[in-house]
Swiss-Prot record:
Protein known as: Small ribosomal subunit protein bS20
One of the record's GO cellular component terms: small ribosomal subunit
PANTHER family: 30S RIBOSOMAL PROTEIN S20 (PTHR33398), SMALL RIBOSOMAL SUBUNIT PROTEIN BS20C (PTHR33398:SF1)
Record's keyword terms, sorted: Ribonucleoprotein, Ribosomal protein, RNA-binding, rRNA-binding
Originating species: Caldicellulosiruptor saccharolyticus (strain ATCC 43494 / DSM 8903 / Tp8T 6331)
An example Gene Ontology molecular-function term: small ribosomal subunit rRNA binding
């Protein structure tokens, strides 16, 4: 337990910041889930549109120091990789002729 007045104030600040960080992280995770949900539904265009919003939220979360910038980069990279994978599966591939 905090003994000094300044330490008690610091606890209040820490609690407030923790709540703000959790809210920011929740928004980011929700945006990522929406992209994945659109991919599972087979809507590639909607997923790409939602990706731009998710990437923005991921960058904001990293800028606020809630997650590390490398973690943010990894999340965006994996999400884009997943979108590209589903996009490749949905487009028909040209058949190769046997020689």
């Amino acid at each position: 337990m905090a003994n000094t007045k300044s330490a008690k104030k610091k606890i209040k600040v820490i609690r407030r910041r923790t709540i703000e960080n959790k809210i920011q992280k929740f928004k980011m995770k929700k945006a990522i889930k929406e992209v994945k949900k659109a991919l599972l539904a087979g809507d590639i265009e909607k997923a790409k549109e939602l990706y731009s919003k998710a990437a923005k939220l991921i960058d904001q979360t990293a800028a606020k120091g809630v997650i590390h910038k490398n973690n943010a980069s990894r999340k965006k990279s994996r999400l884009m990789k997943l979108i590209n994978k589903y996009a490749a599966l949905s487009t028909p591939q040209p058949e190769k002729k046997a020689q």
